[in-house]
Amino acid sequence: MKFFIDTADVREIREAHELGLVDGVTTNPSLIAKSGRKFQEVIQEITSIVDGPISAEVIALDAPGMIREAEELVKIHANIVVKVPMTPEGLKATKALSAKGIKTNVTLIFSSLQALLAAKAGATYVSPFVGRLDDISQDGMGIIEEIRTMFDNYGYTSEIIVASVRNPIHVLNSALIGADIATIPYSVMLQLSKHPLTDAGIKKFLADWESVPK
């Protein structure tokens, strides 16, 4: 399973990369705005840290506009993946970009049928948002299971990126279901290695070591 980090904070990306956990990066307009820096400057710095897929999102809402923006985005670096919203116009853009050999990540997916449409349009990645579904009392991980089953049934090669990850259980369940990728906030990524018994064990080892004659 691959781990992407879901942030535009270069410090977080660098620190997670040093842990050996980062296979790629997902950004969005909200994350870029939060960084307080220029869009292209942030993306270029990210590509210098992580040698893997870097998702950068279009802003246009019409297919021709999305295609134009996508063609500019991929000029930044060969690892750029264009994030496209799950809309009819987004599907048109995805199909056209796929035909041009431009990788796409169809985002804001909230149903397994939306993921199926994105795969049929030629999406490289599909990004279902599990946390936001959980927020409205729907089963976020349930749609990951449905998408995995459908893609396996019909041989779709689009990779499933589990997005809107809120906790380590989301990551665990994604792995058990067989999702290709989880894109994880830095705060959650740090939680993955934590267990109280690990901390207690280290504390005991250190205490025992103090009793060893020096």
UniProtKB/Swiss-Prot annotation:
Residue positions of the active site: 83 (schiff-base intermediate with substrate)
Keywords (A to Z) from UniProt: Cytoplasm, Pentose shunt, Schiff base, Transferase
GO molecular-function terms, A-Z: aldehyde-lyase activity; transaldolase activity
GO CC list: cytoplasm
Residues of the signal peptide: none
Alphabetized InterPro entries for the sequence: Aldolase_TIM, TAL/FSA, Transaldolase_3B, Transaldolase_3B/F6P_aldolase, Transaldolase_AS, TSA/FSA_arc/bac
Reactions it catalyzes: D-sedoheptulose 7-phosphate + D-glyceraldehyde 3-phosphate = D-erythrose 4-phosphate + beta-D-fructose 6-phosphate
Pfam families, per database record: TAL_FSA (PF00923)
Top-level taxon in the UniProt lineage: Bacteria
Pathway: Carbohydrate degradation; pentose phosphate pathway; D-glyceraldehyde 3-phosphate and beta-D-fructose 6-phosphate from D-ribose 5-phosphate and D-xylulose 5-phosphate (non-oxidative stage): step 2/3
Keyword match DNA repair: no
Localization of this protein: Cytoplasm
GO BP, sorted A to Z: carbohydrate metabolic process; pentose-phosphate shunt
Similarity comment text for this entry: Belongs to the transaldolase family. Type 3B subfamily.
Function: Transaldolase is important for the balance of metabolites in the pentose-phosphate pathway.
Name under which the protein is recorded: Probable transaldolase
Source organism per UniProt: Pelobacter propionicus (strain DSM 2379 / NBRC 103807 / OttBd1)
